[in-house]
Amino acid sequence: MGCDCHFFTERWTNQKNYEGPKDIQINRDIKLNSILENGEHQEYSWITADTWTNDDGYWSADEYYDDRNYFLFAILANVRNGYRIEPLAEPRGIPEDSCYPIKYIVNEWKGDGHSHSYFTLKELLEVDWDKYCVKLPEVDRTNWLDDFKQTLKELKEIDKNPENVRCVFFFDN
């Protein structure tokens, strides 16, 4: 059975307009609390940076990264790590302040999703990806990360500040 990564992106902003699943009560409560505290709504939060579509009541995202790459999965979250790679971090879970669309999709997957984690774009850009691009006698891994490195370049277009972009992901079997 194969394992796939469900890779979503968020942007830290005071804008609240996005396409995708919404929880009207959460949006209302955030706005109301902000107005009560500040006199106007200026609160920053994470919103989805993905493009979402609704197909007969089911929401799905056009994910920035959607390849099946067990080598990358091992690096990101110690998933399918038959390579004995030291992961960047053990899975961190879904951030409490994650945007509603991501929480929605995680809930839709219920127990079939696992190893939930996240990194800011800044964290991913600081990784020395070349150290993982090694040529071993049994397999050439020199280009296994090219697609993901291209994704990182595309993610830079979401916001000039890489700390304002967060990648939230999980895996299925």
Language model features: what each stretch is:
Residues 1-164, 171-173:
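Acidic (Asp/Glu-rich) sequence patches and key acidic residues
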